């Protein structure tokens, strides 16, 4: 029986081939070279985490599990609200079929603010990495559950070639062990199981203490309150990717500021 991730991968691979036929790689690479210099995604998170929390605020219109999340979807306005609310970086969904995202959303968000931006998509091909840079992305996502070790290495190398950072996403101890063979410092612990889309913060509680000290933990999914952040900080998480809970708020700037008000709890005692 196919999972949600299986179905996403199937259509994404078809989409990649269609895009290659429509726009040759050389044209994408020319656009990538002409894009503004990367803004330093990992550097910004590391600086924020040194004194408090690093927040990757996500611009997401819909999801496979929740359907439409936000009807009033003005990307530049949302990006500016996140920036004003204290976000460190942005994550922008560009997948269309499952998340109602679009490449243009990433471009709009990048141009509206000075924050580093993550292209949030299902990346399988170096063509998509060049696309990300051409769109203004400063970081890409590699989902270990959906790629082989050799694919992950190839995608990471391509991102590095374009001066971008990589957020390496894991959901299990096995995936974390595989991720440790990559050079990327950012380890995203997804509290959502991408096969079932069920969410549990216990995933971060379990994996965070197993992440090498030279890596920076980003806890993703299922984060709704300042207490959630304070709780996971006790396990070593200092950075968080939050989308749905902020997207559902009428005043996104105020909601962003409020969730960052969590008192920073020192690691230990668990």
UniProtKB/Swiss-Prot annotation:
EC numbers, comma separated: 4.1.1.48
Entry's Gene Ontology molecular function annotations: indole-3-glycerol-phosphate synthase activity; phosphoribosylanthranilate isomerase activity
Highest taxon of source: Bacteria
InterPro entries: Aldolase_TIM, Indole-3-glycerol_P_synth, Indole-3-glycerol_P_synth_dom, Indole-3-GlycerolPSynthase_CS, RibuloseP-bd_barrel
Biological or metabolic pathway of the protein: Amino-acid biosynthesis; L-tryptophan biosynthesis; L-tryptophan from chorismate: step 4/5
Enzyme class: lyase
Pfam family for this entry, one: IGPS
The keyword Lyase is annotated on this UniProt entry: yes
Catalysed transformations (reactions): 1-(2-carboxyphenylamino)-1-deoxy-D-ribulose 5-phosphate + H(+) = (1S,2R)-1-C-(indol-3-yl)glycerol 3-phosphate + CO2 + H2O
Presence of keyword Amino-acid biosynthesis: yes
GO biological process: L-tryptophan biosynthetic process
Family note: Belongs to the TrpC family.
HAMAP family attached to this UniProt entry: IGPS_B (MF_00134_B)
Protein's name according to its UniProt entry: Indole-3-glycerol phosphate synthase
Organism: Cereibacter sphaeroides (strain ATCC 17025 / ATH 2.4.3)
